[in-house]
Amino acid sequence: MTTAKINLLDFDRKGLRAFFSEELGEKAFRADQVMKWMYHFGCDDFDQMNNINKKLREKLKHKCEIRAPYVSEAQHSSDGTIKWAMKVGDQDVETVYIPDGDRATLCVSSQVGCALECKFCSTAQQGFNRNLKVSEIVGQIWRAAREIGLEKETGRRPITNVVMMGMGEPLLNMKNLIPALEIMLDDLGFALSKRRVTVSTSGVVSGLDQMTGKIDVALAISLHAPTDELRSQIMPINDRWDIDAFLASVRRYIASSNANRGRVTVEYVLLDHVNDDMDHARQLAELLKDTPAKINLIPFNPYPGSPYKKPSNSRIDRFMKTLMEYDYTVTIRKTRGDDIDAACGQLVGDVIDRTKRTKVKQQGEAIPVKTV
């Protein structure tokens, strides 16, 4: 019987040091050396780690591996966006590279599929399979950095920002999200500024409260409606944690955070004649009066079978101007990669639905929201 090798990408620095000490009988600085090779140099071959002695390299080759998801398909948009289908086990998740001037953002997935069933999101329609491991989260960044490195002749910018806005709800995968974020921020990891790593949540209050005081990164919240009645219609998670509970948790987090500079980014997808009336804008402005926020409006990105439409430019403009009358900073997200279905809300991947979703829908029952 062959013993499975330990994937070193599953460890943050603390975990890697413990593994080296307890399982390999090595000192902490050896773990630090290997971590630097993995993340600073994108190395997955122990023999190339030339400041590691041969005995340890042989031990590592026997017991360990450095294995990231691999690219099963790549699609290139006319605007420079790249969508990679990355193989995790027997399925794919989608990772999106978005260049924009002097920055390049990587949109990273946290789950295979999603359990939350937001009505306007194509990922939610695919069902939920499982949480991604630490190695499968940071491995998306590792693999993307290597892919970009192979294309240096094209002048593509290295990754400067990471947003946890791909497939899945990050805060329903807290066990693996926290160490993955630690690796992103670690000087021996990807060494990203905490202001350049963003976690987006649809309202998992228990997870956000776990993050408070534990990990400091930029926070974005998927709000998408100004009232509980409307939000529950398009985001079933609101039946578990309503808007007041969600925003109270947000205020607790930003009060303990330096990365957010005292305010949160509110994401609001605009659905034609659903949540984009002027009354909705005024309700949203009133709702956020006690929660320091900048508002990012996202015109709906259509996908096959969706019942929703993108609002007209005039409706989008009126909504934005109404919010600005209340002195909010308001931006409209530029649609990127929509020609390859890589825009916000369009990520699907290759998901085998292992929830009870299909059966439940056939029986007309309510679908429970999974909690941490």
UniProtKB/Swiss-Prot annotation:
The record places the active site at: E94, C344
Instruction: Identify this protein by name.
Output: Dual-specificity RNA methyltransferase RlmN
Every copy of the Radical SAM core domain together lies at 100-339
Q: How and how many cofactors are bound, per the record note?
A: Binds 1 [4Fe-4S] cluster. The cluster is coordinated with 3 cysteines and an exchangeable S-adenosyl-L-methionine.
Q: Mind telling me which GO cellular component terms the entry cites? A: cytoplasm
Q: Name one GO molecular function term.
A: tRNA binding
User: What PROSITE patterns does this protein map onto?
Assistant: RADICAL_SAM
| Cofactor annotation | [4Fe-4S] cluster
Q: What is its EC number?
A: 2.1.1.192
Chain sites annotated for binding [4Fe-4S] cluster: C114, C118, C121
Q: Which UniProt keywords apply?
A: 4Fe-4S, Cytoplasm, Disulfide bond, Iron, Iron-sulfur, Metal-binding, Methyltransferase, rRNA processing, S-adenosyl-L-methionine, Transferase, tRNA processing
> Top-level EC class, please?
transferase
User: Which reactions is this enzyme annotated as catalysing?
Assistant: adenosine(2503) in 23S rRNA + 2 reduced [2Fe-2S]-[ferredoxin] + 2 S-adenosyl-L-methionine = 2-methyladenosine(2503) in 23S rRNA + 5'-deoxyadenosine + L-methionine + 2 oxidized [2Fe-2S]-[ferredoxin] + S-adenosyl-L-homocysteine; adenosine(37) in tRNA + 2 reduced [2Fe-2S]-[ferredoxin] + 2 S-adenosyl-L-methionine = 2-methyladenosine(37) in tRNA + 5'-deoxyadenosine + L-methionine + 2 oxidized [2Fe-2S]-[ferredoxin] + S-adenosyl-L-homocysteine
- Binding-site residues, S-adenosyl-L-methionine: G168, E169, S200, S222, L223, H224, N301
Annotated function = Specifically methylates position 2 of adenine 2503 in 23S rRNA and position 2 of adenine 37 in tRNAs. m2A2503 modification seems to play a crucial role in the proofreading step occurring at the peptidyl transferase center and thus would serve to optimize ribosomal fidelity.
Q: What is its main location?
A: cytoplasm
Q: Record's InterPro entries? A: Aldolase_TIM (IPR013785), Methyltransferase_A (IPR040072), RlmN_N (IPR048641), RNA_MTrfase_RlmN (IPR027492), rRNA_lsu_MTrfase_RlmN/Cfr (IPR004383), rSAM (IPR007197)
- Family, per the entry? Belongs to the radical SAM superfamily. RlmN family.
Leftover remarks: Reaction proceeds by a ping-pong mechanism involving intermediate methylation of a conserved cysteine residue.
Give the record's GO biological process terms: rRNA base methylation; tRNA methylation
Keyword hit for Cell wall biogenesis/degradation: no
